[in-house]
Amino acid sequence: MESHEGIDVVLVTGLSGAGRGTAAKVLEDLGWYVADNLPPELIARMVDLGLAAGSRITQLAVVMDVRSKGFTGDLDWVRNELATRNIAPRVLFMEASDDILVRRYEQNRRSHPLQGTQTLAEGIAAERAMLAPVRAAADLVIDTSTLPVPALRESIERAFGGETVAYTNVTVESFGYKYGLPMDADTVMDVRFLPNPHWVDELRPHSGQHPDVRDYVLGQPGALEFLDTYHRLLDVVIDGYRREGKRYMTVAIGCTGGKHRSVAIAEALAERLEGGDGLTVRVLHRDLGRE
């Protein structure tokens, strides 16, 4: 699907419970600025901000649903208003079968926005009828009835990702076991199998960021082999996370106090990961300076 000059605009709409929120999250991961249920006039103002010189907003996604008063009229107004700026917003319409929507609402124990005193099925039917013209005019319709989230993500990335890479954000975190495991770690590796620089008098005062400590740690038997092997393993894990739609990962490296070995290994591992496609890597030394 083609992009538009100046600012690219996608209006995300569809049946309640069909996955609008998930679609918005995917677009956000792709670098889109996402706004939820803006009044129509604010959508136009947001676009004007995006068109202004120096603006960082080049891709705007707005989630719209039937809770907005005069929804179909609002949508038409937005499209006509943006047309005066030579912008043709694309419409992404999310839908699912009635039985799937009923099941989702029952599982979440929520009421449908159009249900009122009606049955859930009647509320869904009313919304479907109301949105029929919108669906007919949509640029892309995605049926999530049998679509798992990774496949939904792939469909949206294919349609709206353009040349944008959906980055996986990896945090490599060193820590000391004596202070406890990091609560946010997705995977933990123990590097206490390496000799401890703490017992080398001239290295003890320095951290794993010091060149002498780093050289000492990486020069130990098994250190580089560990780094190479773990790097290859993480490549497999990261690819799997991407397929499952997980964009954030914390890799924890632990030693006794979080000062020498884990710091040096975390730094070296991050350097290897930084060469990977579609990765943003940062290093966090949780317990450095804590001793």
Swiss-Prot record:
InterPro entries registered for this protein in UniProt: P-loop_NTPase, RapZ-like, RapZ-like_N, RapZ_C
Q: Which of UniProt's keywords are assigned here?
A: ATP-binding, GTP-binding, Nucleotide-binding
Q: Which GO terms describe its molecular function?
A: ATP binding; GTP binding
Q: Which domain of life is it from?
A: Bacteria
**What SUPFAM superfamilies does the database record attribute to this sequence?**
P-loop containing nucleoside triphosphate hydrolases
Residues that hold ATP according to the record: G14, L15, S16, G17, A18, G19, R20, G21
Nucleotidyltransferase as a keyword of this entry, yes or no, is no
Q: Which HAMAP family match?
A: RapZ_like
Describe the task this protein carries out: Displays ATPase and GTPase activities.
NCBIfam families named among the record's database cross-references = PRK05416.1
Q: What is this protein identified as?
A: Nucleotide-binding protein MSMEG_3079/MSMEI_3001
Q: What is the organism lineage in this UniProt record?
A: Bacteria, Bacillati, Actinomycetota, Actinomycetes, Mycobacteriales
